[in-house]
Regions:
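N-terminal secretory targeting modules
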Residues: 1-95, 158, 163, 302-304
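Structural recognition of the beta-strand scaffold that forms the well-ordered cores
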Residues: 63-67, 92-97, 166-172, 214-219, ...
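Catalytic His-Asp segment of secreted/periplasmic serine-dependent ester chemistry enzymes
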Residues: 111-112, 220-305
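Alpha-helical scaffolding segments of alpha/beta enzyme cores, especially the outer helices
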Residues: 194-197, 201-205, 243-250
Length: 305
């Protein structure tokens, strides 16, 4: 009986030990793979770091930055304006243009509640010069004009080192015109609530903070907005498009800047504008090809001066 009991106890404790052995075996296997797991995690971290480094290097490497509205910024896919300019010039181009924006500031009474305000040229130039896009990034979720490309375009623009940029193109004007923004203030030439004042202010700030940066103005393109007359006839409260264009040309002369005169020279007018745009203002694929090629060729001419 004692022998049987001893045998039973032996089997009992042997069986009790098996799970421990199994646990120890699993633990040993896990320990064995720790170096592999650690190496994998390290590789991912390094890869992510390299990717971020490449991204940041890419942001540093742009020769040309476009600042404008939907004429330059709306399309980010086929035959995009910046892509055509890049192909034409061989220069690296970053598209920092945002649809729906003006050169001038608006709504001075409630500027902190007007979330679209911070992407207008004069406000964006403040961010570029101060190297602080906090306001723009905070406003973006509530921006009623924002398109799908805004978040990435703004995030990447905030990483561009303008000390390494050769040229910036300032293209705004269509929305100042169609929105009836005041043309100019004779008593204050740097009044940012006017089209002319905002342009002068933006040019002055960029020149002061980035003295080696070449600034080129680009006049708005001809347009024919729905249910209105062509832009050389239609006045939305502050003048026809011709007046906004003439003022931009005048400001280029004031500052001794080169200007790419799309309005007068590209060949868009009331007889063909609907062939080159989706709606009388926003360029279609054919229009973007012509526009980007024209701007690129004129840019090369400006760089040779």
């Amino acid at each position: 009986m004692a022998r049987a009991q001893n045998a039973w106890q032996k089997d009992y404790w042997k069986n009790r030990e098996r799970p421990v052995e199994k646990k120890n075996s699993n633990l040993q296997k896990f320990i064995k793979y720790i170096p592999v797991l650690a190496a994998g995690i390290l590789a991912v971290c390094i890869s992510f770091g390299i990717y971020r480094s490449i991204q940041e290097s890419a942001m540093d490497g742009y020769q040309v930055v476009l600042l404008g509205d939907s004429i330059m910024g709306k399309e980010r896919c086929d035959k995009r304006v910046d892509g055509v300019i890049q192909e034409t010039t061989g220069m690296s181009v970053y598209n920092g243009a945002f649809g729906g924006t003006c050169a001038s500031a608006g709504n001075p009474q409630n500027s902190y509640d007007y979330h679209e305000e911070s992407l207008n040229l004069c406000r964006l130039v403040d961010a570029i010069c101060e190297k602080d896009f906090g306001v723009q990034l905070a406003d973006l979720p509530n921006n009623q004009f924002q398109s799908w490309y805004f978040p990435e375009a703004l995030e990447n623009l905030s990483k561009v080192d303008f000390n390494k940029v050769d040229v910036v193109l300032l293209e705004h004007g269509n929305n100042d015109y169609s929105g009836g923004r005041p043309l100019d203030n004779q008593n204050d030439p740097y009044d940012i609530y006017t089209f002319g004042g905002a342009l002068r202010y933006s040019i002055r700030e960029l020149q002061e903070h980035y003295p080696d940066l070449k600034i080129i103005l680009v006049t708005p393109n001809f347009c024919w907005i729905d249910d209105s007359e062509p832009c050389n006839v239609q006045d939305f409260g502050q003048g026809t498009m011709d007046e906004y264009v003439d003022l931009k040309l005048q400001i280029a002369e004031e500052f001794g800047l080169d200007v790419i005169d799309v309005y007068h020279e590209i060949g868009f007018d009331e007889t063909n504008i609907l062939s080159y745009t989706e709606d009388g203002i926003h360029l279609n694929e054919s229009g973007r090809e012509i526009y980007g090629t024209f701007v690129g060729e004129k840019l090369l001419e400006c760089m040779e001066k």
